[in-house]
Amino acid sequence: MACQLDLLIGVIFMASPVLVISPCSSDGRIAFFRGCNLTQIPWILNTTTERLLLSFNYISMVVATSFPLLERLQLLELGTQYANLTIGPGAFRNLPNLRILDLGQSQIEVLNRDAFQGLPHLLELRLFSCGLSSAVLSDGYFRNLYSLARLDLSGNQIHSLRLHSSFRELNSLSDVNFAFNQIFTICEDELEPLQGKTLSFFGLKLTKLFSRVSVGWETCRNPFRGVRLETLDLSENGWTVDITRNFSNIIQGSQISSLILKHHIMGPGFGFQNIRDPDQSTFASLARSSVLQLDLSHGFIFSLNPRLFGTLKDLKMLNLAFNKINKIGENAFYGLDSLQVLNLSYNLLGELYNSNFYGLPRVAYVDLQRNHIGIIQDQTFRLLKTLQTLDLRDNALKAIGFIPSIQMVLLGGNKLVHLPHIHFTANFLELSENRLENLSDLYFLLRVPQLQFLILNQNRLSSCKAAHTPSENPSLEQLFLTENMLQLAWETGLCWDVFQGLSRLQILYLSNNYLNFLPPGIFNDLVALRMLSLSANKLTVLSPGSLPANLEILDISRNQLLCPDPALFSSLRVLDITHNEFVCNCELSTFISWLNQTNVTLFGSPADVYCMYPNSLLGGSLYNISTEDCDEEEAMRSLKFSLFILCTVTLTLFLVITLVVIKFRGICFLCYKTIQKLVFKDKVWSLEPGAYRYDAYFCFSSKDFEWAQNALLKHLDAHYSSRNRLRLCFEERDFIPGENHISNIQAAVWGSRKTVCLVSRHFLKDGWCLEAFRYAQSRSLSDLKSILIVVVVGSLSQYQLMRHETIRGFLQKQQYLRWPEDLQDVGWFLDKLSGCILKEEKGKKRSSSIQLRTIATIS
């Protein structure tokens, strides 16, 4: 046990990564000089060096002085030298604690007989593919290697296994490999120094043993007499039935736990009869060898003959995989009372009968995958009372009436379209890669008693034609439904209760089911669910409450999630959300912030969590996107909503008030004026004193006097009422009788702050009115300010107004007032007219930048 532990430690030392060491350097413990073009052992080594790696160099000589004293060195790698190697006597004596010496794939031109002396603690010696001859075994090269446990001499030029007597001293030797040599025979006297030893492995793979020469079996006798072998590897030697039988005869009585005869040529194969299949006598002599494992895989056996293994009472594992077995003879397995594992995979079996497996009272595992089995009799496996695992994957089965009540049934890769509702129990049921379509089969399987693991990947589950009774299965722990078409079933509104009653389910796979939504409450009963895979579907959104409450691991990768809510993932321990189609706008800022702050373990590379929109951010990692511009918007989101409500209400009220005001504008204006008078009741209206006698000269046709007096003058002129505030001038009252009419007009225009022309049909026909209009325009030009106010009265159109040249010039440049048609607007109009009269107009300064020049006169 101590030797095996030391060997394990040595292997660990060798396999440890050296990537942290710079090439052609040493860190004190590891000296890494692989491929450094060295021609000799470097002397710059530290005495603390434990591993020295010198492969792939040009070192051609190793002698006693090649190494400094390295008492801690445990691994020396000198393999694959590009120069022929000469190893002198005591070449490694300065490495007293060496555990592993690797010289493999170096062409050793000279190997001194004392080359390995001084290595009392050596556990493993690798001399594979070194060009060594049989002399390395017969001349005592391995003397005094008392700790040697593993010797690898594979791939050399050894033709004889005649061992030197010093092998008797190698009490720790347990693993010897002579594979890939040309050793045509082995006889009893050659391995005599190994008698009394127990070897864990003895390799003779591809040595052409007994297959190229005529062997005197009686004189050669048992080469393994007195040797106990745990594993004897005789594969790829081209053994026929006769060679196998003769070898079994000469080694009878030798204890061999595992016999490997892979890649043999026993059996005719399919369609041939020139080579015999093994029969009852082939392995009969192994009865006293206590063989526990027999590997006959990769051959050409076509038929398993009756009682073929009848004498192998102790056999526990039989491997017949990769043959051409098409027929199992009657009682072919008779006598295998202890067999536990039977491997018949990768053969040509087409049907199985009730009698095929008679004689296997303790078999627990039967592997029949990758045959062509299309039909099985109902009682074929039910007679195997201890059967625990039945592997029938990748066959052509269309029915499962034969299923026994066992722990594990593997039926993936068959042609099952419908499952008969038979009664059976199982712990593990695998039915992937079949042709199941109706979810009624899923409901049936979920009711199988004691079922803990159910695999239905890569079927066609898509149909749900009727309501089903929910499955009550308190034992199911893992359910795999990857690569089906559940979307087609669920979009009809049926089978939403398929997971109801699965109270102990812990793992659920729903990947690749074309799901674009999750039915409401689909996971409500999965109170124990810890892991859920929804990857590779078409989900765009996950609704709050759609995930199980106790979920810890969620795979939602390769969907079409746009803006997921991070609150859904806050209770998870592990999350895979890679390869989705994220829309990178401010709505995603909360999720981006969560990604950078969460304690949830996120699977995948950050580069796999990327934007799909907008195009400016296409392919950019969410981890690299700044959300600073969105912080203010996020903080103001609730305020914005409140403002939205406020604005909506305000706008509605405004529209209502506007409609009311428009409808009852006259009343509203009167109320406004009343309030204004109440507010300013203590203030006396006073006009700024100035040079004007009147506030306004009202010019109108005498034919319009009655209307003007009733509509305007009584409401504006202070002489009519003390409540009026304007001093008005008009012809009928204020013109001086007998005075020149032009003078009166001129005095009225120039003596008033503003001139108001009431343009009506009579006005346009009255010459004096038009003359007063021209005087007012003349004053406007003189004072460089607008003192003319035009009020259009009646139904005069724009065309009628523009016909008069005097009026046209004003209307093209100035605004005018029109007497309201609705009586409720009269008050507002009078107020506006008063405001226009009282409004002070600032005159424009005359430009002084215009230079005048004298124009020559022509006489």
Swiss-Prot record:
What effect on the protein does mutating G619A have, as reported in its record?
A: In strain: MOLF/Ei
Name the gene.
Tlr5
Example GO molecular function: transmembrane signaling receptor activity
Report the glycosylation sites. N37, N46, N84, N246, N343, N438, N596, N599, N624
What assembly does the database describe for this protein?
Homodimer. Interacts with MYD88 (via TIR domain). Interacts with TICAM1 (via TIR domain). Interacts with UNC93B1; this interaction is essential for proper TLR5 localization to the plasma membrane.
Topological domain (Cytoplasmic) residues are: 663-859
- Give TM regions: 642-662
What does it do?
Answer: Pattern recognition receptor (PRR) located on the cell surface that participates in the activation of innate immunity and inflammatory response. Recognizes small molecular motifs named pathogen-associated molecular pattern (PAMPs) expressed by pathogens and microbe-associated molecular patterns (MAMPs) usually expressed by resident microbiota. Upon ligand binding such as bacterial flagellins, recruits intracellular adapter proteins MYD88 and TRIF leading to NF-kappa-B activation, cytokine secretion and induction of the inflammatory response.
Positions on the Extracellular side per record topology: 27-641
Q: What's this protein's family per the entry?
A: Belongs to the Toll-like receptor family.
What disulfide bonds does the UniProt entry report for this chain?
A: C584-C611, C586-C630
Q: What is this protein called?
A: Toll-like receptor 5
Q: So which domain of life are we looking at? A: Eukaryota
**Record flagged with keyword Disulfide bond:** yes
Task: Cite the post-translational modification comment.
Answer: Phosphorylated at Tyr-799 upon flagellin binding; required for signaling.
